[in-house]
């Protein structure tokens, strides 16, 4: 049996979560499909040109987010480290992304912030849509991250994928354009 590559694992995981996460976001946005208790009701209302929704999903998510008191992360017992982290939090713009990061967690169960130094070795950090990212953990030690992946559709429909390892990045580009 052929060894499954990290690229194959990433593509499979990212493909698998798209439909489910899109559905969760539609529910949050109030676009839930109408569900009937019987076929008869479905037949009676099939020609109805109206939309009825009661979006309790958004109420639950928003009430949790509204009650959260978001703070800059800190390092317990390390004031200098906490000050540096606070500075990075501000400089990278994560302070402006806090709500979206937590909203992702509340809707999908996960959120991603990708941090990496730029060409000038200055740390950059960005919130990324959970539908576009995957974290793969070691099967024997679930606290150890093996790699992370992000894919996105670039200009012209080309799909790009980056695998993030602790010591390197691997870049992949599709040979042809794909329809999103």
Ranges and model annotations:
Residues 103-180:
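Structured, contiguous alpha/beta core segments that scaffold functional sites
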Residues 1-126, 142-144, 155:
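Extended, helix-rich architectural segments
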């Amino acid at each position: 049996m052929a060894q499954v590559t990290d690229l194959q694992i990433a593509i499979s995981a990212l493909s698998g979560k798209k439909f489910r996460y899109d559905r969760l976001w539609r529910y949050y946005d109030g676009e839930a499909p109408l569900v009937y208790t019987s076929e008869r009701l479905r037949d009676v209302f099939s020609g109805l040109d109206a939309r009825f929704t009661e979006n309790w999903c958004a109420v639950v998510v928003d009430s949790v987010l509204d009650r959260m008191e978001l703070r800059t992360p800190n390092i317990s017992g390390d004031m200098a480290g906490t000050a540096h982290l606070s500075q990075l939090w501000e400089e990278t713009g994560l302070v402006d992304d806090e709500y979206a990061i937590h909203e992702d967690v509340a809707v999908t169960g996960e959120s991603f912030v990708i941090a990496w130094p730029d060409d000038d070795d200055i740390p950059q950090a960005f919130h990324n849509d959970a539908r576009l990212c995957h974290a793969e953990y070691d099967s024997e030690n679930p606290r150890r991250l093996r790699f992370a992946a992000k894919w996105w559709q670039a200009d012209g429909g080309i799909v790009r994928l980056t695998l993030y390892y602790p010591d390197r990045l691997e870049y992949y580009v599709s040979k042809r354009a794909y329809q999103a």
